[in-house]
Amino acid sequence: MKENSNMNVSTFFARADRTTRASFAVRICCFTLVTVLLTFSSASVRGEQVLLGDPALTSGVPGSGPISVPQIETWLDDEHNFTELTPVLPLGLSQGSSQITGLDENPLTRAKIELGRQLYFDPRLSVDSTVSCASCHDPSMGYTAQTKTGIGIKGQAGGRNSPVSFNRILSDKQFWDGRAGSLEEQAIGPIANPIEMGFTHEGVVKRLASMPVYAKQFEKIFGS
């Protein structure tokens, strides 16, 4: 897993999953690319405001690389990580707060953010374990890629430049042409795209379910 931890990436993941849930029969599959299964969300303790972009939002994550089962168990035992978070925008941008959507149905928590971070940088979501979300949306390159088009498995070139994934919580429309109406709708595509990650939804669900670190997080956060 690529080393990194960033609130904006994690917020992107902690949003997504209504469309995924509707598309997959197996409940855990909703988390193949993103980190929220709304129907099975665990009870959260309400009430903490966090500044969008503040590094404190990801403070205390169990690690920035591969995480052990004992580490994640300790993390999941901390009820603070299940406190419901309300993101607010920095001074001067507060008028944009009305554009933050989806959190009423899908409360944001540090536990979801951390799971999303792990998935974002994990190439095992692709069929040959070579391409992660961060491969085409790299934080060190402004959450995009310095190539003409996105590059997927086996070096295949996509049809368009990779759009910036930074702070996507502020927009419902996704992709350059806006064809996806939400992050939830967008998130189910890349894994099964033969050029991008080349996997199947069923295959990635089975793979994630076989990994104890992921299985424990899904069970504790979503009950499945």
Locate predicted features:
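Bacterial N-terminal signal peptides
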Residues: 28-40
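Periplasmic c-type cytochrome electron-transfer domains
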Residues: 2, 12, 23, 40-224
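Bacterial N-terminal signal peptides that target proteins for export
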Residues: 5-31
